[in-house]
């Protein structure tokens, strides 16, 4: 995809470098023009980093955070007039600075402090230490496996999405999930620390209503960006539907996306179900690639999206353009399966495709993250500031989806539940079945069900706090990764 600055064009290498700085994620997780504008941006970022205090204490870290925020924060003219001396940590000071934007939903924790190592590991590959599954809470506060990562320890032990966790052995014998929840057991107690070799026993109810007992150990794993393989869903008398379950916009997702698009193109698929229900976003460069693959043939060289900075940094506003790849598909209709865990880069892709092709949402409304962050590193320290620095609009300069894409009134949403008890592509799974129905009938079911968010992100006195309010770094809202 080509990137222009004030009508100019950047090389693919420069775009790749910019992508390292730009992040689009909900987090605990964007004919050739002169490159001098881009070089100016990189130089400015380098100067800003090198000119800040190098000491790593909280006092100077707060000064550094304030300096960067006043210069680069998207709404820098709305920062709260607070005294850094009133706050014990730089994160607390940052929260206070951005409180006016948190209150109205524009920045509810999207700006945060982390470390360079944690940040880079999260958004280059998504690697972490764990069992290799994501859990979610369903009806009656039951705990289900929402997703199991291929080739991870849980997958190798036979665990699959839809299995219900009945009991956990934390080292002192099995205890029921209900008992663990009622006594407020912590996440670390139930699933153990993020340490290689940590073992837990699980008793689960499988898809045949039989009890499966397994003991598994944590390992370092890198969840595949695409769940299983791209699939063709047969339809009697019609061309098949292409199904893709896309987990995360990490650097490791580029080749799988290209391969999936090539597969669909060779099969002549025109109707698609793109499952983004747990995709909280990621890197701008991967959103770039996905848009080219999905929309490059429809809108080659037309504007795809626009990054808008604050008035002080307006020189760095940038348009992106669709570009046709040899693997780009020829779509007629897209159904995107979404939840409140669908955010940021996922929303960018949907919003940018909408002016060019028929798009419908199935599930529940999206998160509403219409902004992206740059990464700022404190010199000589391990601190990295992820700061909301630009707003994301589509090629027609339409955005503003701070309460979700459907809430803008510009998208059709067919209400459906995320049925944690069934596999993703089970025709009886409500979201998948509704998506197929829309492609068949061209309309939402006549009597849509009442959709509620997963219990794990609603209030419930029966659940421990860590399930009610999962840290943003763990991915999709309401679904814990273990």
Stretches found by the model and what they are:
Residues 1-2, 356:
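Short intrinsically disordered, low-complexity coil segments enriched in acidic
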Residues 24, 63-71, 433-437:
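Short, hydrophobic/amphipathic alpha-helical patches that form generic packing surfaces
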Residues 16-18, 61, 427-432:
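Alpha-helical structural motif
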Residues 32-271, 286, 451-482:
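Flexible, low-complexity junctional segments that flank or bridge functional domains
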Residues 274:
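P-loop NTPase catalytic core of nucleic-acid-dependent motor ATPases
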Residues 237-244, 248-271, 279-482:
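C-terminal "post-core" interaction segments
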Residues 3-19:
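Bacterial N-terminal signal peptides that target proteins for export
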Residues 27-30:
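N-terminal signal peptide c-region/cleavage motif recognized by signal peptidases
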């Amino acid at each position: 995809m080509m990137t222009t600055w004030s009508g100019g064009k950047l090389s693919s290498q420069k775009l790749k470098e910019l992508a390292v700085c730009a992040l689009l994620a909900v987090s605990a997780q964007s004919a050739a023009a002169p490159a001098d504008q881009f070089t100016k941006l990189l130089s400015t970022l380098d100067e800003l980093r090198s000119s800040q205090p190098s000491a790593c204490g909280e006092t100077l870290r707060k000064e550094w955070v304030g300096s960067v925020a006043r210069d680069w924060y998207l709404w820098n003219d709305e920062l709260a007039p607070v005294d850094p001396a009133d706050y014990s940590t730089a994160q607390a000071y940052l929260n206070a600075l951005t409180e006016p934007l948190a209150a109205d939903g524009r920045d509810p924790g999207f700006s945060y402090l982390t470390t360079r190592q944690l940040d880079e590991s999260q958004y280059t590959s998504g690697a972490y230490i764990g069992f290799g599954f994501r859990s979610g809470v369903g009806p009656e506060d039951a705990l289900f496996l929402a997703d199991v990562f291929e080739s991870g320890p849980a997958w190798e032990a036979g665990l699959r999405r839809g299995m219900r966790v009945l009991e956990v052995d934390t080292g002192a014998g099995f205890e029921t999930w209900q008992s663990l929840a009622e006594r407020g057991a912590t996440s670390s107690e139930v699933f153990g620390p993020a340490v290689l070799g940590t073992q837990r026993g699980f008793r689960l109810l499988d898809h045949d209503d039989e009890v499966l007992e397994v003991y598994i150990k944590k390992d370092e794993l890198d969840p595949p960006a695409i769940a299983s393989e791209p699939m063709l869903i047969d339809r009697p008398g019609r061309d098949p539907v292409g199904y893709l379950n896309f987990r995360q916009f990490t650097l490791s997702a580029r080749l799988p996306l290209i391969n999936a698009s090539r597969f669909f193109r060779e099969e002549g698929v025109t109707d698609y179900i793109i499952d983004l229900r747990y995709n909280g976003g990621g890197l701008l460069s991967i959103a770039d690639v996905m848009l080219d693959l999905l929309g490059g043939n429809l809108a080659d060289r037309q504007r795809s999206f626009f990054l808008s900075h604050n008035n002080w940094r307006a020189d760095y506003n940038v348009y992106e353009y669709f570009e046709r790849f040899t693997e780009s598909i020829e779509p007629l209709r897209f159904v995107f399966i979404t939840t409140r865990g669908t955010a940021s880069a996922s929303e960018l892709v949907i919003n940018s495709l909408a002016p060019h092709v028929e798009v419908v949402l199935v599930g529940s409304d999206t998160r509403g993250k219409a902004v992206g962050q740059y990464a700022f590193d404190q010199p000589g320290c391990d601190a990295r500031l992820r700061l909301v620095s630009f707003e994301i609009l589509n090629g027609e300069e339409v955005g503003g989806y701070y309460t979700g894409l459907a809430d803008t009134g510009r998208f059709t949403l067919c209400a459906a539940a995320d049925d944690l008890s069934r596999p993703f592509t089970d025709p009886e799974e409500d979201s998948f079945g509704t998506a197929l129905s829309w492609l068949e009938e061209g309309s939402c079911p006549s009597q849509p069900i009442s959709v509620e968010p997963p219990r794990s992100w609603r209030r419930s006195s029966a659940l421990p706090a860590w399930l009610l309010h999962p840290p943003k770094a763990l991915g999709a809202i309401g679904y814990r990764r273990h």
